[in-house]
Amino acid sequence: MVYGKLSTRGSEEVFEWNHSYSKIYQPKVKYNPKGVFMYFENYNVEVRDRVKCISAIEVGVPVSTQWDASGYFYPIQIAQFGLSHFSKNLTDAPPRLVILEDGFNYLADWVSAEKSHFKRRKDGSYRVLEFSVKDRRMPGVVTRVDKLHPSLLILQCALRMVGNGSLVIAVEDKDRGFTYSLIYTCSQELLTVNGNDVIYGIGDCPDQWHYLTRDLAIDLLKGHVVSGRGKKISRTRLRLLSLTLKGEGQITNLTLRSSAHESQFRSAAEWLVKHQDVVTGGWPIPVRRRFGPGIQELNPGWISAMGQGQAMSLLVRAYNRTGDEAYLRAALNAVKPFQVASAEGGVLARFMNMYIWYEEYPTTPPSFVLNGFIYSLIGLYDLLTVADQFQSVRRIFDAGMASLKKLLPLYDTGSGSTYDLRHVMLGSAPNIARWDYHSTHVNQLLLLSTIDKDPILKTTAQRWMNYMKGKKAPHN
């Protein structure tokens, strides 16, 4: 099978073809842990089918349905969410934004119905809009936003509810021909749909401030998926109509933006700090993982070297960005599982009892997944750039790089690469990496070749790129 597209070269129209559907990103400069992470500025974690929604309860991070349809917090997915938004924050244009209400300088045009009222006042260090709508059947306190630029689909605010209040955004979906209500309310229910109402719980509301950053297009999309209305949405076909306050509470710093990458990457970094097991240094994965015949399944609570590595990459960037030592402490603590055998709850394995390996899946017998191992090495390298005085981190990184260089040939099929080494460990057929994983291998090796000049990294990457063009290793 070949893949391709029509393009123009000079005055001629040509068909550019490839044996692969994946893209290679040639690094132009040496990899920098203060900059974009690989090519993650092109990632959009939120739209993935395996993301149930972005939690409004747990500081705005994705909830995964991979391996468990009920949904759970998957550290790898959360780290990738943070890394993608960190990278977009560096590459995207500055956002459009409109401050609607801050209680002082920016005052929205609110309208209150019968038995509803609002007023502005100072509350501690905040200037706030205080509202009271005691009869929830009434329209509430409303402001229109239908004249604003259509790209302003990110909502941010500080919201404090007294009792069971809610913030309601009316959104017109022109493709479906309906208006939907996005409702953020005091509840522990993650996401529910009732007709055209898409309801997100923001947790219990014991008269405390909630700081929301919500991508309204994504929130509506996930509601459509739950209700069976389809898995696609066009941001350009959405129009915000109004914002409504119900119940009793206060709101301030109410803003609509075209993007909020800084807040989103920080949400992921803060989640990692908050949910790290301080004893083990890991982010336990709370689901059972079945890996395949001949390999024992992983029980809930396993730790992934890939998760540890990508978390370190995000935490180092958050530390570089903010100077907050909490991020650095968490990144350093994340090294602990690299020193504990995978059979004992860590991620450390050995190939043929000789070569160190850090397991994406700490299976018995070891599985030696390539892409997850390399992501762990990138995370260790990132950490070394801010903590090179820690010799244990240096030893762990150097041992991993030495193993990678020795074992890379075992992943080469002559026409592609393998995902892992089960063909060696089990004597089974090789687990051939599909093209998107193969291209990930290539992109990872190209990145490493900018920080380590050993020719095996660059030459292997080049050979594996040629496989994507249909070239194969010669036969005898």
Predicted region positions:
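Short carbohydrate-recognition loop motifs
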Residues: 111-141, 185-187, 192
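Well-ordered alpha-helical segments within folded domains of soluble proteins
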Residues: 74-89, 302-319, 367-384, 433-449
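Exposed low-complexity, polar/acidic, P/S/T/G-rich flexible segments that act as propeptides
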Residues: 238-263, 285
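Carbohydrate-binding/catalytic loop surfaces
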Residues: 44-69, 281-302, 348-371, 413-440
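Structural helix-adjacent loops and short alpha-helical linkers that scaffold large soluble proteins
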Residues: 88-98, 222-224, 257-267, 318-333, ...
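Extracellular ligand-binding interfaces
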Residues: 132-138, 148-222, 248-250
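Extracellular carbohydrate-recognition regions
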Residues: 7, 19-21, 94-115, 257-259
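Long, well-ordered core segments of solenoidal/helical folds
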Residues: 3-13, 18-68, 164, 172-175, ...
